[in-house]
Amino acid sequence: MWKFNGEEITDIDQFPTGTFGFVYRVFNKNTGKAYIGKKVLYHSTKKKLTQKELAEIEGQGRRPSYRLIVKESDWKSYWGSNKLLLEELKTDKDNFERSIICLAKDKKQLTYFECKYLFIYSVLEKPEEFYNDNILGKFFTKDLPS
């Protein structure tokens, strides 16, 4: 279950229209350690059109060679990507809570807000408080002066 503005979010219809994804925080109530990340609500994949489907497309100009398929992501069951966090969740899931920090309308905004909160909370400088060990795969805890 996710919480956003004090309300439980259990269904995709509870998000405002046009929401692309959200920035979230997973909190370990036992250790006080947290993880900040982002999650998209929908995944899109390209499926190559069959010969029959291509033949059905009429008109002039270039015909598409694929169809875009959009599906709801695994946001309901998602907890994060950090290995240590996922290990601790295996044995102690009841002591974790998930909350949504903010919503985003597109991919660029989602990445911006995730970075914004990671830097606001100085996650790389506080490894005792956060599971996060990198930002965008470019900035790492190990590269900072100790």
Model-derived segments and spans:
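Structure-specific nucleic-acid interaction/processing domains
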Residues: 1-146
